[in-house]
């Protein structure tokens, strides 16, 4: 074996030893449940000690990712605004039942589909819903103008730059994840993007929310990319229009690694802002 081969073998062994240290799980060590980022309502649990405790039902936890799927024009971006508003202000008037646990973390929204004007209008909804412009932890980017590889690289760069500046990443929105690949049916690229998302959630201890279309005529997310998201996501959220309720969008938990959150509806208020339905609400517009 040449010296060069020995060096390569040594580097390989060191790399595998590092992976072994990072990935080994001690079954006798207590690992805490990942902290909740955004939740909908709560549940009561009886502990092994017989104590009754109330816990938030997660939509997403830190260190994991979720994705929203729906057919075109099902108000996916409005729902993203609803989650973002709840994350920025859990006591808002539009987000009944939704809670968040932001503490001092940052909220970052990457839009890949819309031009600057439409993107800004979406980003500003959170200001309008909370009647404030004092959101210095809220970072917004419209990435339509750059290529899919540059989008991946920029997201990675920006998350790292915030971390290097001493910031803690909280929730990251990527609306839409299909624009991080050349084709949602490209197996290699789809796998790479989902692996990237999983790595980012681990490295930055954040929750990532992605958005993807459903296939025409089915409830499956688009392409190989959608299949990879289904396999790896903590929570799969589905939006559907309810023909029996005026203007309502039904939000359901299609899959979850946690207790599934309860189905709920939202619709636009008289100002065109998304609002969770309350039983006492009366809609006449």
Model-derived regions, located:
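Short, surface-exposed amphipathic charged segments that create phosphate/polyanion-binding patches used
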Residues: 5, 9-12, 148-160, 248-257
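The Walker A/P-loop phosphate-binding site
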Residues: 8-126
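Short, solvent-exposed loop/turn segments that connect beta-strands within catalytic domains
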Residues: 51-54, 165-166, 243-247
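Conserved catalytic network of the ASCE P-loop NTPase/AAA+ motor domain
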Residues: 60, 99-103, 130-132, 162-166, ...
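Phosphate-binding/switch region of NTP-binding enzymes
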Residues: 67-69, 73, 77-78, 191-281
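Alpha-helical scaffold elements adjacent to nucleotide-binding pockets in ATP/GTP-utilizing enzyme cores
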Residues: 83, 118-126, 154-158, 192-196, ...
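Conserved inter-motif catalytic segment of the P-loop NTP-binding fold
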Residues: 101-188, 270-273, 277-285
């Amino acid at each position: 074996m040449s010296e060069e081969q020995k060096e390569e073998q040594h580097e390989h062994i060191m790399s595998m030893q590092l992976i072994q240290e990072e990935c080994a799980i001690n079954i006798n060590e207590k690992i805490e449940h990942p902290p909740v980022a955004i939740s909908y309502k709560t549940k009561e649990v009886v502990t092994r000690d017989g104590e009754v405790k109330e816990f938030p039902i997660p939509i997403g936890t830190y260190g994991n990712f979720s994705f929203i799927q729906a057919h075109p024009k099902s108000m996916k971006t409005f729902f993203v605004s609803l989650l973002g508003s709840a994350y920025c202000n859990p006591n808002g008037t539009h987000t009944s039942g939704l809670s968040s646990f932001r503490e001092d973390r940052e909220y970052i929204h990457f839009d890949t589909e819309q031009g600057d004007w439409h993107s800004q209008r979406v980003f500003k909804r959170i200001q309008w819903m909370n009647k404030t412009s004092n959101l210095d932890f809220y970072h917004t980017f419209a990435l339509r103008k750059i290529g899919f590889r540059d989008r991946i690289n920029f997201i990675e760069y920006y998350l790292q730059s915030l971390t290097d500046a001493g910031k803690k990443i909280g929730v990251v929105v990527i609306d839409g994840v299909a624009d991080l690949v050349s084709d949602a049916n490209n197996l290699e690229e789809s796998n790479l993007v989902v692996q990237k998302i999983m790595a980012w959630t681990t490295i930055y201890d954040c929750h990532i929310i992605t958005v993807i279309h459903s296939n025409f005529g089915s409830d499956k997310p688009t392409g190989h990319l959608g299949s990879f998201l289904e396999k790896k996501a903590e929570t799969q959220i589905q939006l559907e229009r309810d023909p029996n309720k005026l203007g309502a969008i039904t939000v359901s938990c299609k899959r979850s690694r946690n207790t599934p959150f309860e189905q709920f509806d939202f619709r636009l208020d008289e100002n065109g802002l998304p609002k969770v339905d309350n039983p006492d609400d009366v809609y006449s517009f």
